[in-house]
């Protein structure tokens, strides 16, 4: 059904399989009104549409259209043979006081051949807490009954709860137990219209905390591209948009970071096929009907382009940078960044161990990215001093260890970086070496760095450089032990590197490439991020050292023979996993009896491995038989 192909934290590029084809996520579903198709489905497919959403209430309430839909199917009405989602009409019920039979609407969507139907949920905008709580209970009750009526149609069970985060969490938790195919987050249209992005961020986060990670999340009614980077970074996969046509009727043009009225525009600031073929003045002088169509096409081009930009950022690993840059386009998005900052501990659970692109500073929120939080936390918890005395240095050119005299100091060398304290031995791991900051950082980053440094020095004796010896010769050994402790956990360095140790370096760069212990290859150090790739011998040593379930991915006994042969681990065969595992971590693959089977790199964290029914969980590097 849904499968992750690549990711940047909670943002997923995935494939979602329906009866009428695959949707590559993240994706936008344009809204089509079957009564008034200003743009045909075929035209929108050429722009990038993969799927559409239409309102089943509109079809249901028109007798002629209803009969045709029941006879020919909704795909025929829309003139599109790909994936079609239907909304139940809940928003119309809220806006116009319409009463809809909940189960009849689900059955109707099923009977007209919708690929993805939606429950009749209760929209809670201005309700007080007690009323919103009752409406959540009713939404869940309807969802539970609707699951029995859906047949082979995928069902979207919408998370409601108004502006109350705890009710959103409660609703999501109860709906998650139903194992629906899609989980929309509803009730955000009024918040979008009022630009209450902080409320939207909190609603998404509290809902995502309880929703099953194996299901795509649809942010209902959020069709303006200004919110796409943030929403996708928080785990939303699907969006729908009626804004493209609604705004066009009002002569408003959508751009990635704003909306402009046509009357206010003097110059074209867009290179889409519409805007590059006519001038702004020509657009203004068009007949109303043609102008609406042209602006609607422009609006869709801009919206699809933003989805493509976000996908590119996911692939490159710099989505948080895009989110931060977009936040400066509207003050309310900066308020949303405060909500995100408060949830960085939770976000870290889903964050990649490293990224393809460097960590680029873009402002005061950069230091609060999940990967920066992880760096700070692990250094505080996992770094082990090698000397009684420590020497502190100001930020310098990276990697810090290029300065040979630092390696010879008989002291713990600590650099005060914008990230906080960085031990010299960890200067090449991601994101330390792979980061760019201006020399003059913002005051919040400066204060955060100084606060972390004070905490780090609390149990250290900090002295001047002239007070320590300068004859240390074992920097490489200190480095590999420190990286192992940071990457795998405290004590990993001693467990991996004991006996006769040979450090193999690149002839061209002089950087560590492999570590051989007692004649056996234990680990390789990656040039891209400064972390280790585990070899079988290294896996054996860590398996013997760490108690179960540390670093483990536990697979079904039936899958064990395939893992030994070096086959990849698929999520459906995972029984359990270590809670500390993060996406793209090196892991130990074991069976139900904790027998060591191999080493690999995971794509998913524990929650995802246990929830997904499709896709790869671990890319096996070596099986025990591969030696």
Language-model segments: residues:
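Gly/Ser/Thr/Ala-enriched C-terminal appendages of enzymes
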Residues: 242-335, 448, 490
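Glycine-rich phosphate/ribose-binding loops and adjacent secondary-structure elements
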Residues: 137-140, 147-276
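Non-catalytic, usually N-terminal nucleic-acid engagement modules in DNA/RNA processing proteins
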Residues: 1-151, 359-384, 393-447
